[in-house]
Amino acid sequence: MRVMGVDPGLTRCGLSVVESGRGRTVVALDVDVVRTPSDAPLAERLLSISDAVEHWLATHQPDVVAIERVFSQLNVTTVMGTAQAGGVVALAAAKRGIGVHFHTPSEVKAAVTGNGAANKAQVTAMVTRILALQAKPTPADAADALALAICHCWRAPMIARMARAEALAAQQRQKYKDKVDATLRAAR
C-alpha cells in the first residue's frame, strides 16, 4: 500500500510518501516540506499548498492519504490555518477518488514510538530508525509527515476490520428492523 502522509500547516506543510511491505516493513519514497510566506494572502498560500499536493498526487499516485487531525490549540489563528491546509489536501485527494484518513497526534506518536505523549525528538528518532534513514528528516514537519504515513500503514488493517464490523452491524440492525416492522404489520 502506498500512503501519502501530510502534516498540514500554512507556513510549512510536510508531505511524504511511503510504501508498506510485509509485516511492519515501510519504505520511504519521498519527503518534502511546502513553504508559504506568512505575509502572503491566505488564498495564495492555500493555492500553493493545493498545487504542490496535486503534483504529489499525480507523481506518486498514493492509495490513501493520511492527514493529521487538527485538535484544539490555544492559538485560534494557527488552528484555523492548519485546518484549512488539511482541508485543501483532503479535497485534492477526494477529487481523485483517493481515500483520506485523519489521525490524531497522539495516535501517530503511539503508533511510531509506543507512547502517545512522545516529544518531537522521540518521534523523529523512531521515524529515522523505522525507515532506516541515513539522517534524521528535517524540519520536524517532514518527520511528522513520515510518521503519519507509517501510522496509517500500521493501522490500516485494523481500520479495515472496523469498517467491515460496522457494515455488518448496520446490516444486522436493518435486518432486525425489517423483522420488527413485518411483525408489527402482521399484527395489525
Swiss-Prot record:
Keyword DNA repair: yes
Protein name as it appears in the record: Crossover junction endodeoxyribonuclease RuvC
EC number: 3.1.21.10
Subunit comment: Homodimer which binds Holliday junction (HJ) DNA. The HJ becomes 2-fold symmetrical on binding to RuvC with unstacked arms; it has a different conformation from HJ DNA in complex with RuvA. In the full resolvosome a probable DNA-RuvA(4)-RuvB(12)-RuvC(2) complex forms which resolves the HJ.
Single GO MF descriptor: magnesium ion binding
Subcellular location as annotated: Cytoplasm
Organism this protein belongs to: Mycolicibacterium paratuberculosis (strain ATCC BAA-968 / K-10) (Mycobacterium paratuberculosis)
InterPro entries to which the protein is assigned, alphabetical: RNaseH-like_sf, RNaseH_sf, X-over_junc_endoDNase_Mg_BS, X-over_junc_endoDNase_RuvC
Main location class: cytoplasm
Principal EC category: hydrolase
Keyword tags: Cytoplasm, DNA damage, DNA recombination, DNA repair, DNA-binding, Endonuclease, Hydrolase, Magnesium, Metal-binding, Nuclease
Encoding gene per record: ruvC
Coiled-coil segments on the chain, per record: none
Active site: D7, E68, D141
